[in-house]
């Protein structure tokens, strides 16, 4: 069983709070998303803009990793009582993909490349994710997916380590 965005209904999505909670529940892994920052680092983040889930604004690609790590990723999260219990929490921060791999060495990770293939970020993200996976020896526990078929094709060009690859929507429909 995988926690979607780390378990976004229970904790601020794609934060250490969410991933820790999924581990505590005994889940097998996480479904997560990655985007490339201005300084070409991968972060664990779904949206192209930081506005919906943080106290910041603008595109992920217009901020450095250091700038993004200063944002409060628990800022807009509300619980079932419409409270904001994780606002300002030290584990409600944006994680880099490398941090995710380091913090959870025994968890499976289904990672979705979000950056569109026709953007600068999209052109280099497949190589960056491949390099991160190899650097952390995580090739046996990561599945790389994307709604963009071109991203899977690009990742495949680098993939000499037999890292699992998910089918695109078009491939599933065929």
PLM regions: where:
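Phosphate-group recognition and catalysis centered on beta-loop-alpha active-site segments
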Residues: 1-174
